[in-house]
Amino acid sequence: HVMQRQNSTCHSKYRMNQRKNVNYKPNHTTMQTIQQTIDSTPVRTFATERPEYLLIQPSARHELKNDGLNREAELIAQASARGFVLAAFDTCQWARALMPWHDDAVAVDCEVGLHARHTLCFVLHRLLPWLEHSYGRMPCIVGGYSLGAMWALWAACQTNRFCAVAAASPSLWIDGWSIYAQANPIMAQSVYLSLGDREEHCRNQRMRLIGDSVRRQHLLMQTQLGNHRTTLEWNHGGHFGDEPQR
């Protein structure tokens, strides 16, 4: 999605899209899938012919269980005119690996908030060098879903290594996010945000803040990057609907 829209002039528009009605046309005939372990971290890669972009994202066990990664890679290949390598690295302890600081609303585990930087170091110093050795150096997009999307935005404020961010349903309701985002400008050149239109109507009082949090992030991205470099897309449904498609 980000690959297709980097040069678009209408990035700032809110978009509503019901994914189930999207028709895709295959653009890649073959895709190579590799399962690799790097520093004890399982990594699954999907590579099309003649890749032009790296896509990196944290993955959780439910994505593997539901075959979500395979479906995601297939949909990207069908929808994109550009070749790519998608690398999903396992985060079996989701909150520990991705939360940049502690928030009891996410988990009371005292380890939560201590390891997001370690995850970023793994990506920058272990995963990316392996990918570049295997496929060559190319622009790198970081993305994710839920806490993974929040981590992707956080990471893009820590390093200029990522050219773009794809954040689907980012957990920007966590305590302190707005302060962090204001104080740490994003270093990527393009940012894609999405949210389900039912997410801000949930019963959880903290999670109900997500709509305004994402709108505020989108406005901040417009200020930092320009209107044509950021998109906020509204999808039908709640937080757990159509994850691979989104």
Where is each model-derived feature located?
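A conserved short beta-strand
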Residues: 161-173
